[in-house]
């Protein structure tokens, strides 16, 4: 069985880890970082950039740079790039492809399976969309687990012999979750979960952006939010200011030439104190308190029974957030986990459980929202209450609402409201062929089945006729099998194009390197090379120079090889006479130009440089 990777597919950043020798290891990406920005950008020539290189050019290419796509998972939202619509699943798949490639480079083998984390408060549509994204990226998603639960796995792996209750406070780039767990004897049991899928670091950035924009507007009468490029610069500055204020009491926001009017160019030079930052983001911090109260209430425990507080997500580095959690719980949060990496580490641990590498660990998660069906009068009748341990299955008998009714439409809903219309409809299906009878007589058994991924299947059985209908919930906002297959093929096509681009960069780089080394060596060898031999080398050298900027890669490779062989023959002759090593001719090494001899990191530096040059 191949390696199963654990992926934290985040709103702003993503991370991947794997089990090695019984220990989870965070995989460094091709840029040398342990996290990858969840950013995708499309270039004018159709090239696609993912991660740090995409984020770097977002200011100059705001219209074709996609950020925080996770906030739209499970919705009908589309991204229009040059007339082509991309779903959130397809954009997320591009990030996953990059993560998959980095993992394969690290492991030296193909990776086809993964455990992916989602916010605990993600509904069924959002979870299914995440699985679809994995499939498009060429990954079989073996398990979807909740982010706070993954963090608890990372925290508790070496503490399995003790029994204690923990609260996981997870404030990421785009979502907020809080989970109450009980750890003991290798069992990780989620007692309750709550959260807000529209609260995260992006919202803190937005508050700072609005503050800067309003201050500038008051002074200059110009609203920078109407200018896309200025807006992108504002966002970058706001995020930087937020990060700096986590360790400093004041930061300077300096954006020269942010815009211009009839009087000339305009600049931003603004000091932002931590106190002001806390003031403008106070409501966001307070929004995280109520979910904590609800989670404790649902778990039927008091705050005094919580022994450990774990902070997860980059936004928990904000001092006001830490202070709010401390004030609410009366305890100092634990410093035992890395907030940026622990979710991916936990996912890798779960992957290890699936492969058998991690033993004696049992994970008992819960469904975050109540599941039920719409009944007479539009009432939402619950079958599975929120915070029920999964996997689970539950059945209930219903009947018809009218005389001689021969079919029923079953509307599956998810949420906590009393009326069906106020909850999210996950899907509808019809049970036909019911024998005509007075209302209330037919017995229709509705069964809900939730798997370990939190994905729902619903069936209805007419106990009188034996007729049955069922549905695996795939909301209308998700992709059908045909759309997923199409997206998979496009993703493979992109991967092939990326491979060709990289091959081109390596080929051109090898040619340039060889030309430089050959000219340098000829100069250093001087008269030691006969005129005849020098003419032969020069002929091959000029032939390579003539075609190296063309599109025929095979011809360039052939010319590179011919020059390598010709010069090696000449240098061998020179150094044989001197009793030396031909590979030291003027520092010349015939293998140095070969891509196979370059370190992976060097390849990536060249790759990035090539892309940046293209943008100019």
From Swiss-Prot:
Pfam families: HSP70. It comes from the Bacteria. CDD domains: ASKHA_NBD_HSP70_DnaK-like. Residues 579-605 are annotated as: Disordered. The modification Phosphothreonine is found at residue 175. The keyword ATP-binding applies. One of its GO terms (molecular function) is ATP binding. Acts as a chaperone. Belongs to the heat shock protein 70 family. This is Chaperone protein DnaK. The gene is dnaK.
């Amino acid at each position: 069985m191949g390696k199963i990777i654990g992926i934290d597919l985040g709103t702003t950043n993503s991370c991947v880890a794997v089990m090695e020798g019984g220990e989870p290891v965070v995989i460094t990406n091709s840029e040398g970082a342990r996290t990858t920005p969840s950013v995708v950008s499309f270039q004018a020539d159709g090239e696609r950039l993912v991660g740090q290189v995409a984020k770097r050019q977002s200011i100059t290419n705001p219209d074709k740079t996609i950020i925080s796509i996770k906030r739209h998972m499970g919705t009908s939202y589309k991204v229009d790039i040059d007339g082509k619509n991309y779903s959130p699943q397809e954009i997320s798949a591009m990030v996953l492809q990059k993560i998959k490639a980095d993992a394969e480079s690290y492991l030296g083998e193909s990776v086809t399976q993964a455990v992916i984390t989602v916010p605990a408060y993600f509904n069924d549509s959002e979870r299914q969309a995440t699985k679809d994204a994995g499939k498009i990226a060429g990954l079989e998603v073996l398990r979807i687990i909740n982010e706070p639960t993954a963090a608890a796995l990372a925290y508790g792996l070496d503490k399995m012999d003790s029994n204690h209750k923990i609260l996981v406070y997870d404030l990421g780039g785009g979502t907020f979750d809080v989970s109450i767990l009980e750890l003991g004897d290798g069992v990780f049991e989620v007692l309750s979960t709550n959260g807000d899928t529209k609260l995260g670091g992006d919202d803190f950035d937005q508050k700072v952006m609005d503050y800067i924009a309003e201050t500038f507007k008051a002074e200059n009468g110009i609203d920078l939010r109407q200018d896309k490029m200025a807006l992108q610069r504002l966002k970058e500055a706001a995020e930087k200011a937020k990060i700096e204020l986590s360790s400093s009491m004041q930061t300077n926001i300096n954006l020269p030439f942010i815009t211009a009017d009839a009087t000339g160019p305009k600049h931003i030079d603004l000091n932002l104190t931590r106190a002001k930052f806390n003031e403008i983001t106070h409501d966001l911090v307070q929004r995280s308190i109520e979910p904590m109260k609800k989670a404790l209430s649902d778990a039927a425990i008091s705050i005094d029974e919580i022994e450990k507080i774990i902070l997860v997500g980059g936004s928990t580095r904000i001092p006001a957030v830490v202070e709010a959690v401390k004030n609410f719980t009366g305890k100092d949060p634990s410093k035992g986990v890395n907030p940026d990496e622990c979710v991916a580490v936990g996912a890798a641990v779960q992957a290890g459980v699936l492969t058998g590498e991690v033993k004696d660990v049992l994970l008992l998660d819960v469904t975050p929202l109540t599941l039920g069906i719409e009944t007479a009068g539009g009432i939402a009748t619950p079958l599975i209450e929120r915070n029920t341990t999964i996997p689970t299955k539950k059945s209930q008998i219903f009947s018809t609402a009218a005389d001689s009714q021969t079919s029923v439409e079953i509307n599956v809903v998810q949420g906590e409201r009393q009326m069906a219309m106020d909850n999210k409809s996950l899907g509808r299906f019809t049970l036909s062929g019911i024998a005509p009878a007075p209302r209330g007589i037919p017995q229709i058994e509705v069964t809900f089945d939730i798997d370990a991924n939190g994905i729902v299947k619903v069936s209805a059985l007419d106990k009188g006729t034996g007729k049955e209908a069922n549905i695996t919930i795939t909301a209308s906002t998700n992709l059908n099998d045909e759309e997923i297959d199409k997206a998979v093929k496009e993703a493979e096509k992109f991967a092939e194009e990326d491979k060709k681009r990289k091959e081109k960069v390596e080929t051109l780089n090898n040619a340039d390197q060889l030309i430089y080394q050959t000219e340098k060596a000829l100069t250093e060898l001087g008269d030691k090379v006969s005129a005849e031999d020098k003419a032969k080398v020069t002929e091959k050298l000029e032939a390579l120079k003539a075609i190296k900027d063309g599109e025929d890669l095979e011809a360039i490779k052939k010319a590179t090889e011919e020059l390598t062989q010709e010069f090696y023959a000449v240098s061998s002759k020179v150094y044989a006479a001197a009793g030396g090593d031909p590979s030291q001719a003027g520092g010349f090494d015939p293998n140095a130009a070969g891509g196979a001899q370059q370190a992976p990191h060097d390849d990536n530096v060249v790759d990035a440089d090539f892309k940046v040059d293209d943008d100019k």
